[in-house]
Amino acid sequence: MKLILKENVDNLGHIGDIVKVAPGYARNFLLPKGFAIEATEKNAKALEHAKRHLEYKKNKVLEAAKQLAAKIEGLSLSIAHQAGADDRLFGAVTNMELAEQLKANGIEVDRKRIVLAEPIKQLGDFTATVKIHPEVSATLKVAVTKA
Protein backbone atom coordinates (compact mmCIF):
# COMPACT_ATOMS: atom_id res chain seq x y z
CA MET A 1 0.00 0.00 0.00
CA LYS A 2 1.39 3.43 -0.97
CA LEU A 3 1.22 6.24 1.59
CA ILE A 4 2.38 9.85 1.93
CA LEU A 5 3.99 10.48 5.32
CA LYS A 6 2.68 13.42 7.36
CA GLU A 7 5.22 12.89 10.17
CA ASN A 8 8.79 11.62 10.44
CA VAL A 9 8.56 7.87 11.13
CA ASP A 10 11.67 6.00 12.32
CA ASN A 11 12.98 3.38 9.87
CA LEU A 12 10.42 4.47 7.26
CA GLY A 13 10.90 8.04 6.06
CA HIS A 14 10.42 11.76 6.52
CA ILE A 15 7.53 14.17 6.05
CA GLY A 16 6.32 14.18 2.43
CA ASP A 17 7.95 10.89 1.41
CA ILE A 18 5.87 8.42 -0.59
CA VAL A 19 6.46 4.97 0.90
CA LYS A 20 5.18 1.47 0.23
CA VAL A 21 4.17 -0.48 3.35
CA ALA A 22 2.19 -3.58 4.24
CA PRO A 23 -1.58 -2.96 4.28
CA GLY A 24 -1.88 -4.07 7.91
CA TYR A 25 0.84 -1.64 9.06
CA ALA A 26 -0.95 1.16 7.23
CA ARG A 27 -4.48 0.31 8.49
CA ASN A 28 -3.54 -0.51 12.06
CA PHE A 29 -0.79 2.00 12.82
CA LEU A 30 0.08 4.74 10.33
CA LEU A 31 -3.41 5.85 9.24
CA PRO A 32 -5.17 5.79 12.67
CA LYS A 33 -2.34 7.71 14.36
CA GLY A 34 -2.33 10.33 11.60
CA PHE A 35 1.26 9.61 10.55
CA ALA A 36 0.29 9.11 6.90
CA ILE A 37 -2.42 9.53 4.28
CA GLU A 38 -3.17 7.42 1.21
CA ALA A 39 -1.06 8.26 -1.82
CA THR A 40 -3.84 9.36 -4.15
CA GLU A 41 -3.31 11.89 -6.92
CA LYS A 42 -5.40 14.46 -5.05
CA ASN A 43 -3.34 14.07 -1.86
CA ALA A 44 -0.07 14.25 -3.82
CA LYS A 45 -1.17 17.53 -5.45
CA ALA A 46 -2.21 18.94 -2.07
CA LEU A 47 1.19 17.97 -0.65
CA GLU A 48 3.04 19.67 -3.52
CA HIS A 49 0.94 22.81 -3.06
CA ALA A 50 1.67 22.85 0.68
CA LYS A 51 5.41 22.41 0.02
CA ARG A 52 5.44 25.29 -2.48
CA HIS A 53 3.52 27.52 -0.06
CA LEU A 54 5.91 26.67 2.80
CA GLU A 55 8.94 27.37 0.58
CA TYR A 56 7.46 30.72 -0.46
CA LYS A 57 6.88 31.75 3.17
CA LYS A 58 10.37 30.61 4.14
CA ASN A 59 11.94 32.69 1.35
CA LYS A 60 9.86 35.72 2.32
CA VAL A 61 11.02 35.51 5.97
CA LEU A 62 14.63 35.06 4.85
CA GLU A 63 14.42 38.12 2.58
CA ALA A 64 12.97 40.23 5.43
CA ALA A 65 15.80 39.03 7.70
CA LYS A 66 18.40 40.02 5.11
CA GLN A 67 16.87 43.50 4.81
CA LEU A 68 16.93 43.91 8.60
CA ALA A 69 20.56 42.74 8.66
CA ALA A 70 21.47 45.37 6.07
CA LYS A 71 19.80 48.06 8.23
CA ILE A 72 21.71 46.91 11.32
CA GLU A 73 25.04 46.68 9.44
CA GLY A 74 24.70 50.31 8.38
CA LEU A 75 23.99 51.48 11.92
CA SER A 76 26.51 52.54 14.55
CA LEU A 77 25.27 52.92 18.13
CA SER A 78 26.77 55.42 20.54
CA ILE A 79 26.25 54.77 24.24
CA ALA A 80 27.28 57.19 26.99
CA HIS A 81 28.21 55.44 30.22
CA GLN A 82 29.79 56.52 33.49
CA ALA A 83 33.45 55.57 33.69
CA GLY A 84 36.32 55.85 36.13
CA ALA A 85 39.73 57.45 35.64
CA ASP A 86 41.24 54.45 33.82
CA ASP A 87 38.36 54.31 31.27
CA ARG A 88 36.73 51.33 32.99
CA LEU A 89 32.95 51.49 33.14
CA PHE A 90 30.93 51.39 36.33
CA GLY A 91 28.97 48.28 35.41
CA ALA A 92 28.84 46.99 31.84
CA VAL A 93 27.01 47.63 28.60
CA THR A 94 24.53 44.77 28.25
CA ASN A 95 22.55 43.35 25.38
CA MET A 96 19.44 44.88 26.96
CA GLU A 97 20.90 48.38 26.58
CA LEU A 98 21.83 47.61 22.98
CA ALA A 99 18.28 46.38 22.29
CA GLU A 100 16.87 49.62 23.75
CA GLN A 101 19.21 51.69 21.56
CA LEU A 102 18.16 49.71 18.49
CA LYS A 103 14.50 50.25 19.41
CA ALA A 104 15.16 54.00 19.68
CA ASN A 105 16.51 53.81 16.12
CA GLY A 106 13.36 52.05 14.91
CA ILE A 107 14.68 48.48 14.87
CA GLU A 108 12.91 46.04 17.18
CA VAL A 109 15.16 43.10 18.15
CA ASP A 110 14.82 40.74 21.11
CA ARG A 111 17.74 41.19 23.51
CA LYS A 112 18.44 37.45 23.47
CA ARG A 113 19.35 37.70 19.79
CA ILE A 114 22.17 40.16 20.53
CA VAL A 115 25.38 38.29 21.29
CA LEU A 116 28.38 39.99 22.89
CA ALA A 117 31.70 38.12 22.61
CA GLU A 118 32.56 39.43 26.07
CA PRO A 119 30.94 42.01 28.36
CA ILE A 120 31.70 45.61 27.39
CA LYS A 121 33.42 47.10 30.45
CA GLN A 122 35.63 49.77 28.89
CA LEU A 123 35.30 52.87 26.77
CA GLY A 124 35.95 52.41 23.06
CA ASP A 125 34.58 50.81 19.91
CA PHE A 126 33.15 47.29 20.00
CA THR A 127 31.09 44.95 17.84
CA ALA A 128 28.14 42.77 18.70
CA THR A 129 26.51 40.04 16.63
CA VAL A 130 22.75 40.15 16.07
CA LYS A 131 21.31 36.76 15.12
CA ILE A 132 18.20 37.67 13.16
CA HIS A 133 17.53 34.30 11.53
CA PRO A 134 19.32 30.93 11.71
CA GLU A 135 20.90 31.73 8.33
CA VAL A 136 21.32 35.50 8.76
CA SER A 137 23.32 37.47 11.30
CA ALA A 138 24.51 41.08 11.36
CA THR A 139 27.42 42.88 12.98
CA LEU A 140 26.48 45.89 15.07
CA LYS A 141 29.05 48.61 15.76
CA VAL A 142 28.94 50.06 19.28
CA ALA A 143 30.89 53.10 20.47
CA VAL A 144 31.01 53.55 24.25
CA THR A 145 31.77 57.10 25.40
CA LYS A 146 32.16 58.77 28.78
CA ALA A 147 29.00 60.33 30.20
Swiss-Prot record:
Biological process terms in GO annotation: translation
Pfam families in the cross-refs: Ribosomal_L9_C, Ribosomal_L9_N
Domain of life assignment: Bacteria
Matches recorded under NCBIfam families: L9
Protein name: Large ribosomal subunit protein bL9
The protein's role, per its UniProt record: Binds to the 23S rRNA.
PROSITE patterns the record matches: RIBOSOMAL_L9
Keywords: Ribonucleoprotein, Ribosomal protein, RNA-binding, rRNA-binding
Family membership: Belongs to the bacterial ribosomal protein bL9 family.
Listed GO CC annotations: ribonucleoprotein complex; ribosome
One function term, GO molecular function aspect: rRNA binding
Organism field: Geobacter sp. (strain M21)
